[in-house]
Amino acid sequence: NISLSGEIDIYNAPELKSKLLGLLEQKKGDIRIDCKDLKYIDSTGLGVLISALRHVKDYDGNITIRNLKPYIQKIFRITGLDKVFIIEAQG
């Protein structure tokens, strides 16, 4: 499991990528990402998530994204990523 906070953009997306790669190397089950403190994500950050999902799918896993703020959830909806990732409502 991983929690995202603040902003994920071109400047800090590599840090997110390395965290996710660490989880992916374990090749165990699904990855859950809590976004309750995430305030912003750009296309670079979305690209990192998509790349991670491709790796997870290689071993029949999935990525669940939880607690997206409404305006970030809208980005996932507009880009169609809400159909690719498992999105859980805030709660």
Identify what each model region corresponds to:
Residues D42:
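Short, glycine-rich nucleotide/cofactor-binding loops
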